[in-house]
Amino acid sequence: MYEQGGIPVGCGIDYGSSNSAVALAYPDRVEVVDDAAGEALAPSTLYLHRDGRRVAGTRASELFFRSGHERTICGRCSLAEYGVSDCRQFRRAGSCNDSRLLWSVKRDLANLGFAGTNSWAKDFPVTELVAVTLTHLRRRAERACGEEVTRVVLGHPVVFAGAGGDPASAANVTGRRRLREAAAMAGFEEVELCPEPEAAGLAGDQAPGTVLLADFGAGTYDVAVLHRSPAGLTVEALDGVDVGGSRFDEVLFETVIAPELGLHELPSWLLNELKSLSGVMLLMADPDLRSLLERLGGPASRAVAAILFSGHAYQFYKAVEAAKIELSSRETAELVAEVPGLSLRATVSRTHFETAVRPELDTIDAVTRRALAAAGRRTEDVDVVAVTGGSSQIPAFQRLLRALCPSAELRREAAFTSVVRGLGTRARTIWSTRDALTG
């Protein structure tokens, strides 16, 4: 329920790999904004149609599953400005789908080799793709408050997916620059950035002490060492690594799906792309893949064709994620993935899962210790370990942090909204103060 009264000074947006959220910043409070169905999270999925429609959020998936099979044959297409030879799809295949569903775009923000995608004789820069989601969230905020919202504090990972461990690397600098550009394209006139774990710290309990803030999301793991005192919040160290919950999904694909379907018979490059949704996007856009699978032949190739070309790839990979989530509350999970032409059922144990992701957990442990060392803190100095992010509910992750800081209190922040609430808090601080000074 929203409080009445007041004009917001800005907003905070947590743009995530899987989900995104927005919070309005008022001079006296911060409100996370729900959609009409009462949901704070908007899936970070995009629907693109050849007729010009650009849709973000839950509606994107609904539209694609209704029309994703529709195609236009070259010769009947009027979108290529200089004729069909101007169109990549014509040069490659002779037809194209009328719509596309994109997800995990955030994972490509810092990819120096990825400028965007192409469909219907048009380039879609990655900044334009991100701007669709940011525009969706800005409009949600404006509907909630009845005012124009042109200021935003955008969260960003300490280290972007695929960008290496140095926050100052060219790839990470590019990721932050692209976020700013996307926000401007979405209609924001004033844009500030804030590291996601720092934002989560702003939203947490403000009791004095040293806090290890661990933000384990879908795309990255970020950690902040914070110290709260009567004078305020001090950020003593920030670190991160491009290991997120989606990497754990990939491990399940490697160790459960691939053996069950015999996919290890495939070329290694193809199997590597199949592990992730971002890889699947590239495969589905490759006009030569169908003919390659036909040449390879065999059960594995037929399984891949069923996954990619039945119109149900998204549901297939969400089933893998669902099994991972179920293992956070149960000792075993049933991985049920069914698409036309393919039915897979496998029982996965938590023991198998935790053994399989041990290398990723070791990486998280090393990054956390590195952050503490950079802050000049010993593990016994930590008063509170605060965890946030959708992947922070994984029991093995929480055990790792308990073992690292056994004397600290483990506090579970709001897994999906603590970052956006903190970004809203930062927006309130920045622009309430600035407006007071200039008013």
Model-derived regions: residue spans:
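Conserved phosphate-binding/catalytic loops in two-lobed NTP-binding clefts
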Residues: 175-176, 186-194, 380, 398-425
